[in-house]
């Protein structure tokens, strides 16, 4: 199974994470398929994500980890995936 998860970078006591697409059997910091962005918790939650690639990978079946799913919700990635899969909700017309 392909997962979207965080891989740790940076020095000791100064964590920095990359958001990567990886085979679920690989190690946390092992080889990955593609990097989608980064997350720096020390700089007030500095986050950069390639939204289009993230949506593409989720539509292909990649499963985001719980933490990555929360990050994606902040950027509207999960909402966009839902709209693509199930269509936009039509606004109710009131007469």
Swiss-Prot record:
InterPro entries: Ribosomal_bS16, Ribosomal_bS16_CS, Ribosomal_bS16_dom_sf. It holds the Pfam family Ribosomal_S16. It comes from the Bacteria. GO terms for biological process: translation. GO terms for cellular component: cytoplasm; small ribosomal subunit. The keyword Lipoprotein does not apply. One of its GO terms (molecular function) is structural constituent of ribosome. Keywords: Ribonucleoprotein, Ribosomal protein. Coiled coil: none annotated. Belongs to the bacterial ribosomal protein bS16 family. This is Small ribosomal subunit protein bS16. It comes from Thermotoga neapolitana (strain ATCC 49049 / DSM 4359 / NBRC 107923 / NS-E).
């Amino acid at each position: 199974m392909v997962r979207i998860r965080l891989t740790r970078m940076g020095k000791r006591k100064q964590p920095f994470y990359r958001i990567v697409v990886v085979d679920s059997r690989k190690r946390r910091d092992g080889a990955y398929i593609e990097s989608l962005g980064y997350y720096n918790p020390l700089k007030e939650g500095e986050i950069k994500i390639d939204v289009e690639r993230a949506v593409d990978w989720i539509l292909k079946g990649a499963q985001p980890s719980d933490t990555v799913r929360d990050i994606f919700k902040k950027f509207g990635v999960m909402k966009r995936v839902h709209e693509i899969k199930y269509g936009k909700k039509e606004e109710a017309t009131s007469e």
